[in-house]
């Protein structure tokens, strides 16, 4: 099987979905590997291959520019994370959901409905193995320690009105996340790097229980909340970057 890996650091693009059951290509044609990289706040002038005076050299991106095609007139469905991610996954505007503004946090319910078709589901139907490494930020459904129900925020129907962080059973798998939306493998964080809980997830479970607390120190502007005991702000991206080549190497 060919591999499709999506590295979600943040969203600045959108896609259109193909018809639900339309094959991507003839079954006899070799399908290419697909690597979809999304970067936050990256302008044309930030890439050295497009701007010789760029502040940072980007040799690997420059190789893609010199050996491929470059599009410089792109548009996104939103200027913030959650709605633009929703559009990439589903091909729809996020305002078609009940989320009419703002973004989700680390404890929000799943934004993508169970029966909603997505780009990775389309690829799975066409013989691809799919993976996502990085920031999800589309919500998922936590399991709780009790059968208690919690009131939702009237301004955001996917977000709880009260702090439910101590109500979550972090040892149980969650639903509605990447592996329920078309990805065979997931490694990363539920929401933005500044939202708790500050722990990594693999597939549909946390890889560790948040036993410490992240506190803003004036430099790392995180919302206070649970974190992995030995996790500090500067480490949050590193391990996700280490995981991506592993999946690609296994699929090629």
Annotate each PLM feature.
Residues 2, 18-252:
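Formylglycine-dependent sulfatase
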Residues 5-14:
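Bacterial N-terminal signal peptides
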